[in-house]
C-alpha cells in the first residue's frame, strides 16, 4: 500500500512538472510571436501611460493589445474597446499568460502591459518571465514606493 501511495505521488508530481514545463514553453512561443512588448512601471500614472502608448501604437497601424490593472483592470483590444478580465478573482501576476496567448493568437504586433507587481521578486518575474519587454517605460519613482520599483 505504501508503494502504491508513493507511486501515485511520484506520478502526480511528474505530471504537474510536465504541465508546468509545457505551459512555460507555450508562453514563450506566444511572446516570441509578438515583436513589440512594452511594460509600463512606476509609482503613479501607469494606467494612463499604458492607454496612451497603446493608442499611439494603434494609430501607427500596429495591431495592439493592452492590459491595465488596479481599479481599471481591463484588456484593451485592437479596436480600442475594453474587456473586463478579472471579475472578482484575486490579483496574480500569472494573469499575463492568457492575455499574451490571446494577443498572439489574434496576430498582435504589439502588447502594452501595466506592471502589476509590487515586490521586487514579482517585478523581476513580470519582466523576465511573463512579459519579456522589448521596451520598458518608467512613469516616475516617488519616495513612497521607491523600495518596490
Please give the residue ranges for each predicted region.
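ATP-dependent carboxylate-amine ligase catalytic core
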Residues: 28-35, 56-149
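Short, basic phosphate-binding NTP loop
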Residues: 1-41, 48-60
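Charged, low-complexity surface patches
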Residues: 45-46, 92
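Short polar catalytic/cofactor-binding loops
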Residues: 43-45, 70
Amino acid at each position: 500500500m505504501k508503494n502504491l501511495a508513493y507511486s501515485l505521488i511520484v506520478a502526480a508530481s511528474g505530471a504537474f512538472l510536465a504541465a508546468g514545463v509545457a505551459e512555460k514553453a507555450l508562453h514563450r512561443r506566444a511572446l516570441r510571436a509578438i515583436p513589440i512588448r512594452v511594460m509600463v512601471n512606476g509609482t503613479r500614472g501607469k494606467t494612463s501611460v499604458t492607454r496612451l502608448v497603446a493608442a499611439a501604437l494603434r494609430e501607427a497601424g500596429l495591431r495592439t493589445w493592452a492590459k491595465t490593472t488596479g481599479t481599471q483592470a481591463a484588456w484593451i483590444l485592437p479596436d480600442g474597446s475594453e474587456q473586463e478580465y478579472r471579475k472578482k478573482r484575486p490579483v496574480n501576476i500569472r494573469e499575463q499568460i492568457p492575455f499574451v496567448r490571446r494577443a498572439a493568437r489574434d496576430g498582435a504586433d504589439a502588447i502594452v502591459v501595466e506592471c502589476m507587481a509590487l515586490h521586487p521578486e514579482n517585478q523581476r518575474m513580470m519582466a523576465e518571465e511573463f512579459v519579456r519587454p522589448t521596451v520598458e517605460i518608467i512613469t516616475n519613482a516617488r519616495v513612497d514606493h521607491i523600495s518596490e520599483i
